[in-house]
Amino acid sequence: MITITILKRLLKLIVVIPILFILGILLLDFFPEVEHDYTSTKNDVVLSNSLSGDDAYSTKLSVSDDGSLTIKRNLKSNDKPNNTNRAWTILVYLCGSDLESEDGCATLDINEMAEATASDDYIYVVQTGGTNSWDNDYISSDSIQRLSISNGKVTVLQELEAQNMGEADTLANFLAWGVENFPATNTGLVLWNHGGGSIYGVCYDENFDDDSLTLKELDQAFTMASPYVDNKLEFVGFDACLMSSIETANILVPHANYMVASQETESAYGWDYTAIGNYLAEYPNCNGAELGATICDSFYASAEVSDEDYESTLSCVDLSKVDTLMDSLNLFYSDLYDATTDSTTLAEVSRSVSEVLNFGGNNSTEGYTNLIDLGGMVSSLSEYSNYSDTVLQSLNDCVVYSRYGEDRQGSTGLSILYPLTSFDDYEYTILKDVCVSPYYMSYIDRLSYANANGGNLNGYSNDVWSIFWNNDDSSQMDYWLESGDSMVLLSEQPYLDDDGYYCFTINSDSLDYTQTIYCNVMQYIDDTNVYDLGTDDYVYIDWNSGQVTDGFDGMWYSLADGQPLSTYLVEQNDDYNIYSVPVLLNGEYTYLRVQYSYPDGTTKILGAWDGIQDNGLSSRDTYSLQAGDTIVPIYDCYIDQGDYYDYSDYSYGTEYTYKGDGNDVLLGVLPKGDYCYSFIIYDIFGQSTYSDYVIFSVDEDGQVYY
């Protein structure tokens, strides 16, 4: 029997209309039986919305004058009996958003739930909302609806007035109602939607300006529902991007035993709910860790089917071990804070952190999540603290199971917020609310001060960290919102040497502040208009002398029809480079992810990804291209003003039909014409500086002349 999981990926992989029609007919067999029963469940309980101050939350972190961390939690017990024969209730907070209105992903997951093995030992209970249209005829986008899914049947239980799925009250009411009406030995909660990481949270409601549940609002929701939830939830899961962070785990400790979440972005099709139900039918006495491992394995297997596993991640975290991890982290960051009192050491630390595995893009082309791997950060800075091994062991104890793809080797299961680019005032405020260590906040504060003052720490107050924890007035930290001049100074300005290479030299005192150097290439379309062709690493750097030389040989990426592409380097290691390419794909703006492999010199399109929006909403789907898809290159256009290039607009190339034969994107010699080349110098604070451009020409034989 072909499962919904396989079919939904086949629908994505096959584009020939007659075959799609046949598959659509086959899919009718999997539409679940639907009935309406508005009398079998109780109405919402009346939740207290009068909680304020510390009472509105279940976790409170405080710090003493010596910087030691105190964690106060309103912990629930796990020993209250449930008078029920049901082993598991899985509550699903299904905030459909554009994932449903554009692709029907939420409906497909409901179908997956209905297709799972029939059993009275478990039940799915779903609240729907958050989207402007549903891909079925039994759910309305004008209201909140509640469903039960069991033994192959969907039962519509309640229809309520429209509510914002991005508000704490909405989640709290569903949680309290679900637990009261569907008691079980174990209850799990899945938050289904887009994820925006530790800053922006989860569950963006398409009908309410994409409002989302921040981590603070999640804590509020659980705290409001707490009087009606006798025991801890066995797990809280995020079928969403970017939510497996230490900040998220800290919020969930009082409310659940386990967390299941991804450090990286997820495929739009996410978890395999048929596999989850099948496992619960066979092993109803499983605990959260055992079910969490199954969720991870089935998610990864589904990603493999659709060829989206290369950067997939999913982790199961034991929340009872988080406090020990946080205590050891605070000691580690205390050492790090003490070690970075001078600009040189701070620069060394920042440069090390910049090399740590990060998640969700984190580049100027696609947007920033500012999430890096927690274990990777601690490992990279082990020389600065005697507690690094303790932290890594505690982290290993927390993450009881994880799966990750080839391109995310080395991920340790939990991320942490880190300013890969300067925070704005909103991000700063949220960081203050969710940061898990006063000394880590102090380190970030010192880093922000240095960023605003050109790397200089003169005048920095070592006592300022107490403001973050003991005072709501943050006016003294205005420098968080500033960016100073780059600390990278040149002892020799760019010039053409006798061999025709473009060169410059970094001042020896600035080398520690230099993260990396790329090149930028632009193409002259006529005498004054140029297209930006992107960035690459055609640069040789001598980190001892500071000498930098161009390594450009006239090679660039293009479509098979010869159109150069705007390719922006977003990830590099010893084995491959990954580029982001702005295009219209079937008429929709997105970014192609293109990988160049060094061992065999091959280039392939990994998929398309829509990037990170300004509100932190991360596209869930890195989706595969299919033969027959149309690609139109997009270029940023500039006007040559003589001594600078002035941005004018963007321009489109011509339509290209994707073949899928492995030769759609090629690395080859640029077409004959005039171009310009510049160095881009990135410092450790995330700032970039462009050198002067030098004009070069490519002749009909592919030779480059400056």
Residue ranges and their predicted role:
Residues 37-83, 197, 203-238, 243-706:
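Terminal, contiguous helix-loop blocks that mediate binding/assembly
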Residues 1-19:
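N-terminal Sec-pathway targeting helices
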Residues 89-94, 123-128, 187-191, 234-238, ...:
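Structural recognition of the beta-strand scaffold that forms the well-ordered cores
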Residues 24-41:
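Sec-dependent signal peptide cleavage junction
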Residues 38-183:
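N-terminal extension/subdomain marker
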Residues 96-97, 130, 193-195, 420-422:
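Residue-level signal for short, function-critical loop segments
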Residues 128-231, 240-241, 246, 263-264:
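Catalytic-core segments of thiol-dependent peptidases
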